[in-house]
Amino acid sequence: MGNNKIYLLFVVCFIIQLSCKEESKKAIKTAPVTFKKEGDLRILKKGSDSLLTTLDIEIADTDYERETGLMYRSSMEPGHGMLFVFDDVAMHYFYMKNTEFPLDLIFVDDQLKIASFQKNAQPYKENSLPSKVPVKYVLEVNAGMSDKWTLAVGDSIAYRKTP
């Protein structure tokens, strides 16, 4: 009778094992988000209008583009930036959630003048990065670039969309 119990236990375990199929693991493949040149942007020194730098830019002018920004990207090439264009002049707040590299945020008013900065914003931080004054545009560039270019409040930008 002891052998029957062992045999029955073996059969039950075997049936359970057969019924527990490992579900095939579905690999979710996401395409990397890459830079798409949508315009050119120049930064000009206040007073002299001398050219400080020129950038290839992506333009974020829809709700989705403004909400996503540079999230889910591992880096940004030197000479690239993202220009956020808002419908209204207002206080705008940014954060670095899901952004993988540090950025300088350059806040620009409706006259295309630099109004304030948030320098060296760190990856993945969810703290608020406010514009400090009402603005219409925000330019994101790699961290350290605003100092390298010696940008100051009152400098200006000029941009154009590429066809």
Residue ranges and their predicted role:
Residues K21-P163:
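Compact, glycine-rich, soluble single-domain proteins
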